[in-house]
Amino acid sequence: LFRSLSGTLRTFDIAERDDLVKRAEAAIDHVAAAYGATADFSIKQNAALTYNDPALSTWLAPVLEEAAGAGNVNPASPPTTVAEDFSYFQGQIPGVFYHLGGTKIGEDPATAAPNHSPGFDVDESVLPVGVRAHVMTAIRFLQRP
């Protein structure tokens, strides 16, 4: 009889992730052995850790506020564990990944349908803010001394 168990493991630290993977494999092997079974453990790495460079994040915060308006920029607190292919770029050069809030007016973002779900319904009126944020980031970056 074959059974499969799958899940997602996201951490803010690569060494911590590697340690958790080793510990998970050992725990799974021990549980299987305790029941007279065997286990095949494998990891499929879909995307690397998305890590925002602290100095670049600090530099970018006022630029985003300039683009979005005072009081409209919310730092990710607590940090989020997004898994994006953008992280591969961040492995080569410093980068910042940010979200453009698109929850409908009057809807609580904490209870709104998440991205990539059938109920996701973005307020498209925020798209110009996203364009402005990208353009202002490029302009301000080129204006740096």
Where are these regions (language model features)?
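Metal-dependent amide/peptide-bond hydrolase catalytic core
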Residues: F2-P145
